[in-house]
Amino acid sequence: MSMVTNTGGPAQTTLLTRPFLIVTATAMVFFVYIGMLIPIVPLFIEGPLGLGEFGIGLTIAVFAASAIIARPMLGRLADRYGRRVLLVGGASVAGLAGIASSQVTEFWQLLVMRGIMGVGEAAVFVGAATLIADLSPRDRRAEGASYFSVAVFGGIGIGPIFGEFLLDDTQFERAFAAAGAFALLAAVVALFAPARVAPLDTVDETIASAAPASGRRKIMHPAAVMPGVVLASGVAAFSTFGAFIPDYSREVGLATSGGLFAAYSLTSVLVRIFGATLPERLGPRRAVTIALGTLMIGLAILAIVPTVAALWVASIFVGIGMAFNYPSLLALTVNRASDSDRAWAISSFTMFFEVGSVFGGLFIGGFAQVVGKQTGFFGGVVCCLVGLYLLRFKLVPAGSPDSGPSYQTAMTQAPVAAD
């Protein structure tokens, strides 16, 4: 497999190369699988398995916890054997678990399958996100992450529509098997992805953390911690939307939730396509403030206004919020790490997707079990407020070199005052 190299500065570098498109195609197909399971799993738990909100939350937590446990190993595997092995192996494992879920009859069996799916999803995401960072010039990483996330959110948006259609209220065996087939298809597409990519930029390796290469440093890259905590706040908030909407929308009066997920995903995709350069232009402080603020508004609408119209409006706000939440935080993490640490830093950062899911699944799920789904959306509002505080006062306070549009060069140049 030939290496991808850069022949010019950032202005001459083509971002949307063939390897870039292959990685995004892999992610697109794989996240159709993830999206299909969004309505299928909660309805399966509350239907054939006869459990409630806490059961839904527990499956989210198991999925996330297994991914968290696997993350440190996945980063090392990516550095040692290349990124492609994570894409192919992760998608294959997740696909087989999805197909096996079609034969589940007990809740504990579903928990085992969700745990295996979590490991597979983590492998695919670490491999794909690392390749996207490898393939993006330093000053265009947030833009690259925006385009990549179009595939992620496009798949998540299309998946629930397929899932609800194949489910047809009761056909769980067919729906699980079809979802697993999409993951296996993603593994086939991933065979054409590059295993490794030569650095596009010359980066000062002294950026790496001064922490010793043992103990906590092997598990968590320091550059990922605070961006990851802010990310986790948004993910925990969003988990209320993903977990509660399938059943709550039926309570309010919609026949299915597929359209709501499509509205959220389409909004997010459009923002990321037509506003792909906005994260770089705004800087992480402004971009992530928009993300958490609009996500909070959407969840507050769901908690306060129990109408069909409110569901659609809230879905659009959630889509805007999720469009801005991830790219700037990922780019900030990668730009604070050395090239040799990139897979480790991304593995550490993306671990916080699962940290947020665990918190949202267990604590907000338990809260909703007591107060009901509608009031449970307020748990997501609180998570957004926590994330905003950490972002604006801890991660990128006013005046920080990283707070404005010039943050992408802050680690290699003298500090520049924020706009």
Placement of each model-derived feature along the sequence:
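Juxtamembrane intracellular "pre-TM" segments in multi-pass secondary transporters
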Residues: 3-17, 195-228, 407-416
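Cytoplasmic helix-loop-helix junction between adjacent transmembrane helices
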Residues: 113-152
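Helix-to-loop junctions at the C-terminal end of transmembrane segments
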Residues: 70-82, 271-284, 368-369
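Helix-breaking motifs and short loop linkers at transmembrane-helix boundaries and internal kinks
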Residues: 50, 82, 103-108, 283, ...
